[in-house]
Amino acid sequence: MTFSPPDLSRVPGVLGRIVTEREADYRNADASLGEARAPHRRFEQALRLSPDDRGARLALIAEVKQASPSEGAIAALDPAQAARAYAEGGAAAISCLTEPRHFGGSPEALRAVVAASEVPVLRKDFVVHPAMLREAAEWGAGAALLMVSVLGERLPEFLAMTEHLGLDALVEVHDERELDIALAAGPRILGINNRDLTTLKIDLGVSPHLMARARAAGFSGVLVAESGYRAPADLREVYGLADAVLVGTSLAGSGDLAGAARALLAR
């Protein structure tokens, strides 16, 4: 398979540095996807709420996260133990970082989470190469993150790769331009990141604004609110709009993963 990477020169700031590193990591990797795999849709199904449930509750994607550029070291988590604790606390799915330099992730962490977890697992990384999606499927993940800020107009191509591999795709956006690109590509799961990954600043108003815009545009898929949620009050504005919330730092650094997961979703 002939593959040319996305144009990463247009990606600024912290995000630009990270994706440039990941492109270098995979520059000489095999771009073939292998045999087509049947879709399971377990990740999507675990998150999707009925219209009646959407205003009453949220599904939780709990993240196994050792560190981040904004926080530094967060917690020395045992990935398998963390996965079990999150599931005990009611998580519908688990996100696991595999980016090593800035987030302390690894392939081994993802494999351990998959082996320990009875809920579907998202590979959380900065996907810039087909090999990263092939790996996600081979390692047992049910879904992979696709960032419009990184892939831009190449998003449909990468969505087709996830379909070939039987993976669900969490398509992530942060602003209206990215949302328009995502909606044109027809995703089934759309994540709204409150964090501007070029500056690392958080604005909790981003998710409700873009979610309302997505629903008004006719999007009927799964909506996920991402980043900056530390307490139930933080989630007030996304009830009724979101199906799910993805939470990493506040859970991973809590010292009581199951208890923190339960407390976050308490109403």
UniProtKB/Swiss-Prot annotation:
Keywords attached to this entry: Amino-acid biosynthesis, Aromatic amino acid biosynthesis, Decarboxylase, Lyase, Tryptophan biosynthesis
Presence of the UniProt keyword Amino-acid biosynthesis in the record: yes
Biological processes per GO annotation: L-tryptophan biosynthetic process
Metabolic or biological pathway: Amino-acid biosynthesis; L-tryptophan biosynthesis; L-tryptophan from chorismate: step 4/5
Catalysed reactions, semicolon-separated: 1-(2-carboxyphenylamino)-1-deoxy-D-ribulose 5-phosphate + H(+) = (1S,2R)-1-C-(indol-3-yl)glycerol 3-phosphate + CO2 + H2O
Matching SUPFAM superfamilies: Ribulose-phoshate binding barrel (SSF51366)
EC number: 4.1.1.48
GO MF entry, a single one: phosphoribosylanthranilate isomerase activity
Superkingdom classification of source: Bacteria
Keyword Protease: no
PROSITE patterns to which the protein is assigned, alphabetical: IGPS
A Pfam family reported for this protein in Swiss-Prot or TrEMBL: IGPS
Alphabetized PANTHER family for the sequence: INDOLE-3-GLYCEROL-PHOSPHATE SYNTHASE, TRYPTOPHAN BIOSYNTHESIS PROTEIN
Protein name: Indole-3-glycerol phosphate synthase
Organism field: Deinococcus radiodurans (strain ATCC 13939 / DSM 20539 / JCM 16871 / CCUG 27074 / LMG 4051 / NBRC 15346 / NCIMB 9279 / VKM B-1422 / R1)
